[in-house]
């Protein structure tokens, strides 16, 4: 089949090559020849011979028929060939078209795939867009809700600020008001809209505006908060005191936009404070007045009974007089407790450390205590542990008061047996007293409470408190601590109690070369002008003065005293403070005005008013102060003070200063530090302590106000450690008390300890600085 197609193709190609006519003629000739040959072959086969007619007939018919047939066939073939060629061209075109279609199809497929991909991407993007739209709708909804909440919160905050009684305002960098609350509107009489863009000078009075502008400047200049008090006027003329706090405020990037201010009306607090101060002054005045009114007859009883005891008496008279004398002294000591309680509340307790004849002190203590014990049929024993110093530096009056409280309590709670006082003196300048009784004892659960103010031990029958004020032990312990010591107690119920008192009392070195004791030195005989208006006091004072060998002139009024006084006529002037026509202070001022100071003798106040500060008398021109009743030891000490040598005075002052330093400072530790590291380290540490202490005290006070027990204890512990590290013994002891909530009546006393620390720490620091400077010079 393939050969035929090739032959046919050859046929067509030849025809196209030779042309239709020539190919037709050639084909016709070939057919004629083929016809002749076939005719001859057939004739030969059929007839066995070939005749010429046969040949001619074949040629004739071949020539007649073959050209036309060949031509027709050639035309047909030509047409077919042309058709084939056209068809081939068409096929080729179709192939090309097919290829193009295939290419387009591939491209279309690619485009479709790409389109599908784009469609998928678009669908995804559309989905994401829809999701974004959904989220955007949610966010818009949330923002709308947030906006509503913010508006509600803003409205709530505005309502809250407007409902607040405190002032709230803010000003911009130009010091113009930017907004305020309702309270501020009421204060200024202007609405917020009216207040905006106004300056303080447009709102407040000139005086108030000046302070407002000054404080604003401080806030803007230093970028710190500021708190102060200021009186402001309401539109109706009312005045109110505000505690104002101003703070700078910033945006998120730290740019300052102005200040915010808050003001709290503390007018009522001020009134309350004023009322408290007035009440305190009234109480002090009352106690001062009652002191004078009670002590005047009491001093007469004590003085006259003491004078009468020196006269010849029967046994019964002596017994009665001793009872009167002891009762009056006891009453005086109870009153001293009340006075000291008031002084402690006002932080006015002052120690008068002077050389005290300790031998005479113990003798007086034994005599008076024995008198009291005899009233109840008790034995009194004084058991000193030798050696004891002849003289010590201490406040003899306070020490006598403490011991009298302890001994009086021992006698009060002892029905039978004895009261024993043991005394010893240790190295370190510490005096120890043990007051032991055989009385009812103290229950163990009350041992930690007996030193609390107003606490009274209950008896063992029915739980009733014992008689008394309940302040004696509390006052005594505070005095003991002020004197560098303490009071402790041990007791067994039914067997008695032992109170141990320790105080810091340096001994006075005795001069080996002295030919005689200072106490043996005779006192000078003085001409004394006694200014006193109460006859009983005159009798007591005159008796004491004349007993010491002095001559006495008496003036009953201030006018009489000024008329009687002549320079050089009197060696000593004793001035009562409360006279009918003027005060002793007025007399002192008048004398110092009339005469040169060198022409005046010592002017000494003689008063029963124990509340007055000694400095007040000294400022009025007085030289010293004696309390009533006038006692021989006090008068003797005063005379020696003005008629002894200057060297003795300087020695006394130096010893007194050392005593105060040792009570406040840890001298042994500081001396070791000074020797090891020198003064610079102590000074540097003290500077750090001085810088930190205000913060400590501030936190302590805030914790106390908030009743934060844990915070108080923690801050007390910090102060204790800091004070101990720089040798401030007194502050360390206070810190120890503050950090020890298990101490008896801690909650009742911690406020006083904190107040004491607040009042005293700067003084203690200055004492330490002075000690370091003095030790460095040495």
From Swiss-Prot:
InterPro entries: ArcB_TM_sf, CheY-like_superfamily, HATPase_C_sf, His_kinase_dom, HisK_dim/P_dom, HisK_dim/P_sf, HKR_ArcB_TM, HPT_dom_sf
Catalytic activity entry: ATP + protein L-histidine = ADP + protein N-phospho-L-histidine
Location of the protein in the cell: Cell inner membrane
Enzyme Commission number(s) of this protein: 2.7.13.3
Domain PAS residue range list: 153-223
Entry membrane topology: Multi-pass membrane protein
Cytoplasmic side: 1-25, 79-778
Membrane-spanning segments: 26-46, 58-78
Annotated positions of the 4-aspartylphosphate modification: 576
Main subcellular location of this protein, as a coarse class: membrane
Stretches of the chain found on the membrane's Periplasmic side: 47-57
Name of the top EC class for this enzyme: transferase
GO molecular function: ATP binding; phosphoprotein phosphatase activity; phosphorelay sensor kinase activity
A cellular component annotation (GO) from this entry: cytosol
Mutagenesis or variant effect for residue 292 to Q: Loss of activity
Residue stretches making up the HPt domain: 678-771
Reported modifications of this chain: Activation requires a sequential transfer of a phosphate group from a His in the primary transmitter domain, to an Asp in the receiver domain and to a His in the secondary transmitter domain.
Gene Ontology biological process terms, A to Z: protein autophosphorylation; regulation of DNA-templated transcription; response to oxygen levels; signal transduction
Positions of the Histidine kinase domain: 289-507
Pfam families in alphabetical order: HATPase_c (PF02518), HisKA (PF00512), HKR_ArcB_TM (PF18415), Hpt (PF01627), PAS (PF00989), Response_reg (PF00072)
Residue span, Response regulatory domain: 527-643
Domain PAC: 226-278
Keyword Transmembrane helix tagged: yes
Keywords, in A-Z order: ATP-binding, Cell inner membrane, Cell membrane, Kinase, Membrane, Nucleotide-binding, Phosphoprotein, Transcription, Transcription regulation, Transferase, Transmembrane, Transmembrane helix, Two-component regulatory system
Function summary: Member of the two-component regulatory system ArcB/ArcA. Sensor-regulator protein for anaerobic repression of the arc modulon. Activates ArcA via a four-step phosphorelay. ArcB can also dephosphorylate ArcA by a reverse phosphorelay involving His-717 and Asp-576.
Name of this chain's protein: Aerobic respiration control sensor protein ArcB
Source organism phylogeny: Bacteria, Pseudomonadati, Pseudomonadota, Gammaproteobacteria, Enterobacterales
């Amino acid at each position: 089949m393939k050969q035929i197609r090739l032959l046919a193709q050859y046929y067509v190609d030849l025809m196209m090559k030779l042309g239709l006519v020539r190919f037709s003629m050639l084909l016709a000739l070939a057919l004629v020849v083929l016809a002749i040959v076939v005719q001859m072959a057939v004739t030969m086969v059929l007839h066995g011979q070939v005749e010429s007619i046969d040949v001619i007939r074949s040629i004739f018919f071949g020539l007649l028929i073959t050209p036309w047939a060949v031509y027709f066939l050639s035309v047909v073939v030509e047409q077919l060939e042309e058709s084939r060629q056209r068809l081939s061209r068409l096929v080729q075109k179709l192939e090309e078209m097919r290829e193009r279609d295939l290419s387009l199809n591939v491209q279309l497929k690619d485009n479709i795939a790409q389109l599908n991909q784009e469609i998928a991407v678009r669908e995804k993007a559309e989905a994401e867009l829809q999701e974004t739209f959904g989220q955007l709708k949610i966010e818009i909804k949330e923002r709308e809700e947030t906006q509503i909440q913010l508006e509600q919160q803003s409205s709530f905050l505005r309502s809250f600020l407007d409902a607040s009684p405190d002032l709230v305002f803010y000003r911009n960098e130009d010091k113009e008001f930017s907004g305020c609350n309702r309270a501020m509107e009421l204060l200024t009489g202007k609405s917020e809209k009216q207040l905006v863009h106004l300056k303080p000078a447009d709102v407040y009075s000139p005086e108030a505006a000046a302070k407002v502008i000054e404080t604003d400047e401080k806030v803007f200049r230093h970028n710190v908060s500021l708190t102060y008090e200021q009186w402001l006027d309401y539109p109706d003329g009312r005045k109110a005191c505000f505690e104002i706090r101003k703070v700078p405020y910033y945006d998120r990037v730290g740019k300052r936009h102005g200040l915010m201010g808050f003001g709290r009306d503390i007018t009522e607090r001020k009134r309350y404070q004023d009322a408290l101060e007035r009440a305190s002054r009234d109480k002090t005045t009352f106690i001062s007045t009652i002191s004078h009114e009670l002590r005047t007859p009491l001093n007469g009883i004590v003085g006259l009974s003491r004078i009468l005891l020196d006269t010849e008496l029967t046994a019964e008279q002596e017994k009665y007089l001793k009872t009167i004398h002891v009762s009056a002294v006891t009453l005086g000591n109870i009153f001293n407790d009340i006075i000291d309680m008031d002084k402690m509340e006002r932080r006015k307790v002052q120690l008068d450390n002077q050389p005290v004849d300790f031998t005479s002190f113990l003798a007086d203590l034994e005599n008076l205590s024995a008198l009291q014990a005899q009233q109840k049929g008790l034995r009194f024993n004084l058991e000193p542990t030798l050696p004891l110093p002849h003289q010590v530096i201490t406040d003899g009056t306070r020490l006598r008061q403490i011991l009298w409280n302890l001994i009086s309590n021992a006698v009060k709670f002892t029905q039978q047996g004895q009261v024993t006082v043991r005394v010893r003196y240790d190295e370190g300048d510490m005096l120890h007293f043990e007051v032991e009784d055989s009385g009812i004892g103290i229950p163990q659960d009350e041992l930690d409470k007996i030193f609390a103010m107003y606490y009274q031990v209950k008896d063992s029958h029915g739980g009733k408190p014992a008689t008394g004020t309940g302040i004696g032990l509390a006052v005594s312990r505070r005095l003991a601590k002020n004197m560098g010591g303490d009071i402790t107690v041990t007791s067994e119920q039914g067997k008695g109690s032992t109170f141990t008192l320790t105080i810091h009392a340096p001994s006075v070195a005795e001069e080996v070369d002295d030919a005689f004791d200072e106490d043996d030195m005779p006192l000078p005989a003085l001409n004394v002008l006694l200014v006193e208006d109460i006859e009983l006091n005159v009798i007591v004072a005159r008796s004491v003065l004349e007993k010491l060998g002095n001559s006495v002139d008496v003036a009953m009024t201030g006018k009489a005293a000024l008329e009687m006084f002549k320079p050089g006529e009197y060696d000593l002037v004793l001035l009562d403070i409360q006279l009918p026509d003027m005060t002793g202070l007025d007399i002192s001022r008048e004398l110092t005005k009339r005469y040169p100071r060198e022409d005046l003798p010592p002017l000494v106040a003689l008063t029963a008013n124990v509340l007055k500060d000694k400095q007040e008398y000294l400022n009025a021109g007085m030289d010293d102060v004696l309390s009533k009743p006038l006692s021989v030891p006090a008068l003797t000490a005063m005379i020696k003070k003005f008629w002894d040598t200057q060297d003795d005075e300087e020695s006394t002052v130096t010893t007194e200063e050392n005593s105060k330093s040792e009570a406040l400072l840890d001298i042994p530790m500081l001396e070791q530090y000074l020797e090891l590291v020198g003064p610079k380290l102590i000074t540097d540490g003290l500077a750090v302590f001085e810088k930190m202490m205000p913060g400590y005290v501030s936190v302590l006070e805030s914790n106390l106000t908030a009743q934060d027990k844990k915070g108080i204890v923690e801050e007390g512990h910090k102060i204790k450690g800091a004070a101990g590290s720089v040798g401030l013994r007194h502050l360390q002891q206070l810190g120890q008390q503050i950090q020890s909530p298990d101490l008896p009546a801690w909650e009742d006393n911690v406020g006083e300890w904190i107040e004491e620390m607040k009042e005293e720490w700067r003084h203690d620091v200055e004492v330490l600085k002075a000690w370091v400077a003095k030790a460095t010079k040495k």
